[in-house]
């Protein structure tokens, strides 16, 4: 993992500056004239930019501003760019060797749909320790790359991935630590609509890059209420 991380992060590097003041609008985080995977309004409506009232030093470079209520807001431009980079990375892997993991309730359905759309493996709900390291465990699997929904909730997965040297792409909120993550996608990883949008975009872009059919709507990825 230690050798893979710099290469992936170098490819995904984004320019960062000081955090804008409270008076600046979230849409200003998007570079003028650039084209995003979906409209900025769609990102905002899904709450992809909504972080938490905690931040880690690891995630500081992805923070756009701090609201007066103490909530950290993520930079939508960084989210869009990282989804592109992650999609390009994943498109180089055999889908059957990709593992998507989610212990979070609102992440399980989008992860399941991502797996269905691309033909990847999925481990949803409680992760059984040893599933990546112990061949005696039922459901043991040796992936080539892993996608996790939340580094905190999926901490055991990160630990095992690190021990076997498998690269990890992770959806990371402002409060996450990223020491065992190879490629960060900064996003709200707790919200129902945010998770569905990010997983839908990843699946759509990987399919596009691999020139394979993608016949799913965003609503197909949304966890039913």
Swiss-Prot record:
Question: What are the recorded Gene Ontology BP terms?
Answer: ribosomal small subunit assembly; translation
Region annotated Disordered, chain positions: 1-33
- Highest taxon above the source species: Archaea
* Keywords attached to this entry: Ribonucleoprotein, Ribosomal protein
Which stretches are tagged as biased composition: Basic and acidic residues?
1-13
Could you tell me one molecular function GO term of this UniProt entry? structural constituent of ribosome
Report any Pfam family annotated for this entry.
Ribosomal_S2
Keyword Manganese among UniProt keywords: no
Which InterPro entries has this protein been placed in?
A: Ribosomal_uS2, Ribosomal_uS2_arc, Ribosomal_uS2_CS, Ribosomal_uS2_euk/arc, Ribosomal_uS2_flav_dom_sf
Query: Which Gene Ontology cellular component annotation is one that this UniProt entry carries?
Result: cytosolic small ribosomal subunit
Similarity-based family: Belongs to the universal ribosomal protein uS2 family.
> What is the name attached to this protein's record?
Small ribosomal subunit protein uS2
Specify the species.
Methanosarcina acetivorans (strain ATCC 35395 / DSM 2834 / JCM 12185 / C2A)
Gene behind this chain?
Answer: rps2
